[in-house]
């Protein structure tokens, strides 16, 4: 299976690091690609129950605007834990610890530079999208306001093969704190979810909290404009369909 193959390959990598004698000062950073199995890859439901539990408790999978299409775990660990190691004392990752901090791939850049002993990665002209998440990794008290208070934006203005239902239509979404808003370009509709209370995104709160939705929508639109994001194109009208 793919899991067995991945496990064997990761084991080969760790054994090679050990054979080089550098496992004491080597960090293993492991993460998945975005989301779980796509709609096409999922095929039949587990044990043919008729219930899609591949991503449970998350909704949908890779390519979808819902959490099953974006949320994945991130694991950071020393290749070999050496008690009393001076190198590892500089980054004392608690064993078996779990953080609920909201991270994105760009956060790895400033974090890894810090772990490697880099002094600075900024210049007068540089713009760094990521945030150093070392404190979250070390288990410092949450919430980490810099991580969890910022807006995370996901933008997919393209058509998924076959245009299946389930959030695979062209979309943009934003998460800030506990809240997540999604905009679907084809139908020009918004959805709003409180992820802490509803991780499965089963209850759309867009009608119940219009003020919250409006603030998230304005933030999302401005961030997309600031970054020059491409919009979906109406094939017949041959014009952009910007976020409404």
Regions found by a protein language model. Give the residues of each.
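Metal-dependent active-site segment of extracytoplasmic phospho-/sulfohydrolases and closely related
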Residues: 5-42
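Surface-exposed patches in mature extracellular/periplasmic domains of secreted proteins
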Residues: 24-25, 120-125, 232
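Non-transmembrane alpha-helical segments in soluble domains
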Residues: 7-14, 18, 109-113, 134, ...
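Beta-strand elements within well-structured catalytic alpha/beta cores of enzymes
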Residues: 3, 10, 27-32, 74-75, ...
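C-terminal cap/loop subdomain of S1 sulfatases and analogous C-terminal strand-loop tails that border
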Residues: 36-65, 82-97, 101, 105-195, ...
């Amino acid at each position: 299976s793919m899991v067995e193959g991945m496990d064997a390959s990761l084991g080969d990598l760790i054994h090679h690091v050990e054979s080089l004698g550098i496992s004491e000062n080597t960090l293993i950073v492991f993460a998945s690609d975005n989301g779980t199995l796509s709609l096409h890859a999922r095929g039949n439901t587990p044990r043919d129950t008729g219930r899609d539990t591949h991503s449970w408790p998350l909704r949908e999978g890779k390519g979808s605007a819902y959490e099953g299409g974006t949320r994945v775990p991130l694991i950071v660990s020393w290749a070999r834990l050496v008690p009393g190691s001076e190198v590892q004392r500089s980054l004392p990752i608690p064993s078996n610890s779990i953080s609920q901090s909201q991270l994105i791939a760009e956060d790895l850049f400033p974090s890894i530079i810090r772990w490697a002993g880099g002094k600075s990665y900024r210049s007068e002209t540089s713009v760094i999208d990521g945030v150093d998440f070392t404190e979250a990794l070390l288990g410092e008290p949450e919430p980490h306001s810099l991580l969890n208070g910022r807006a995370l934006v996901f933008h997919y203005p393209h058509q998924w093969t076959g245009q299946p239902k389930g959030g695979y239509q062209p979309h943009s979404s934003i998460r800030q704190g506990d809240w997540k808003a999604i905009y679907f370009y084809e139908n020009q509709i918004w959805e709003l979810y409180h992820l802490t209370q509803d991780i499965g995104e089963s209850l759309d709160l867009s009608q119940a909290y219009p003020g919250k939705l409006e603030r998230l929508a304005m933030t999302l639109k401005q961030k997309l404009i600031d970054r020059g994001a491409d919009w979906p194109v109406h094939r017949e009208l041959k014009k952009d369909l910007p976020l409404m």
